[in-house]
Swiss-Prot record:
Region (Non-LT domain), start-end ranges: 32-271
Underlying gene: mltF
GO biological process, one term: cell wall macromolecule catabolic process
The family this protein is said to belong to: In the N-terminal section; belongs to the bacterial solute-binding protein 3 family. In the C-terminal section; belongs to the transglycosylase Slt family.
Protein name as catalogued: Membrane-bound lytic murein transglycosylase F
Annotated signal sequence range: 1-31
Ranges for region LT domain: 273-496
UniProt enzyme class: lyase
Role this protein plays: Murein-degrading enzyme that degrades murein glycan strands and insoluble, high-molecular weight murein sacculi, with the concomitant formation of a 1,6-anhydromuramoyl product. Lytic transglycosylases (LTs) play an integral role in the metabolism of the peptidoglycan (PG) sacculus. Their lytic action creates space within the PG sacculus to allow for its expansion as well as for the insertion of various structures such as secretion systems and flagella.
Annotated membrane topology: Peripheral membrane protein
Keyword Signal carried by entry: yes
Amino acid sequence: MPIFSTRVLTYLRCIFRLFIGLMLLLTLVGCDFYTPSSQLEQIRQRGEIRVGTIYGSTSYYQRDDLAQGFDYELAKSYADWLGVKLTIVPVYSIAELVELLEKGKLDLAAAAIVVTPERRALFRFGPGFYQVSPKLVYRYGSPKPKDIGDLKGSIVVPAGSTGEDLLRELAKEYPGLKWSTNRDADVEELLKQVADGKIDYTVVQDTVLARTQRYYPELTEGLTLSKNQTVAWAMTKLPDDSLYASIIDFFGQRFMDGAIAKLDEKYFGHVQNFDFVDTRTFLQRAKSLLPKYQDLFKTHARMVDWRLLAAISYQESHWDPQARSYTGVRGMMMLTEPTAKAMGVKDRTHPAESIEGGARYLQHMMEKVPASVPTDEKVWFALTAYNIGYGHMMDARRLTKELGKNPDAWSDVKEVLPLLQQARWHRKVRYGYARGGEARNYVNNVRQYYQSLLWLDNEQQKAHRREELDEDDSSEPQSTERPTVIAEVVKQITLR
């Protein structure tokens, strides 16, 4: 009996071990058939994509409680294309953005990031969608720098920025080149320090400089430090290609349908041909003259922002109620007699009547713009009509179509407008010759003044909020340091 029992037990042990081994084998084999969700599938499953960006006038900012910015709008378009929610994670510097990306707290970074060899070693980049040129910036009135090796004074750039990478590379050729980095200041803060004379130089992309000059006209382009550099979205390097392939597909479609060209026109299409004297004069008058008429613009603005109406008035008359031109137009909005009569204006030199009449006429033009024109571009077509007449604006659209371009895209029509001054072309259109080049410049100027007024108004609102906070917290000690955004952002994302 004992011998039998021992044999049985041994046999049962063998069967048990065989069973366990078989189960382990089946488990391992089963693993071969299990495929984890791709990065893109994970984004769709959680219903959101986390995009890091940087506060600034080109990437991301809040205005009138609405998120705006080239990079923000492009990221929002991508999220909509994927059918998920966009979660924007804004920080103050490229260094903070890189840290979040390295820690896997972001799906991608969209912040006018220049593709460099150093960054390619760390991250994967999507397709390039525009190019920038790095500029050394100095203050108007200071000696113009002639050579990077002869710079005298302080050069300060944001830590981790393309400017820092570029200076480090240039130092190989110019050993005497010295600079410092600031982790707490972003590009626009450093530009303000240059404008205020607190530092001598900084390095920024040409697109940022062009927009910021509208607020700080003292900023002057010195040297171009490198050939054009490519801007692209950055993401963590992974074996999984799903997100990368999706981004390539998205950009391909957006290039084809003109969406990226439209965004480029919206944010950068009006910032060329900077004029120091004109910009400085405008900012001075915006502070001294505009407050006198501001309530009138707010009262009579109809289909447009009151600040746009004020910008039109400045372009027309420099806010001078008695303004008159050789063509006979008069007043704050420089109305012709027939237009004034049609809009119910009896005295063109009366500020309230002129502003109300101009607002009505602009509304009339906007209502006539064809429905096929996108809503956010109607105003530029209406302004063209305001300046040279509705018929000439429609001639420009027809000519644009004849040339194989898009008559509903302002970026295309504005390039065709100057052709209305050439006999070869104005003979072909219904209303003949028009000062199309002037009309294009007119719209560009209005857009520049409008952006400056938006900035000034935003600065005033921020100042009021700071005053309110100071009053509320006057009994508590105030910190002069900017909060460390990255720690709070990481904490918020981790707690999701």
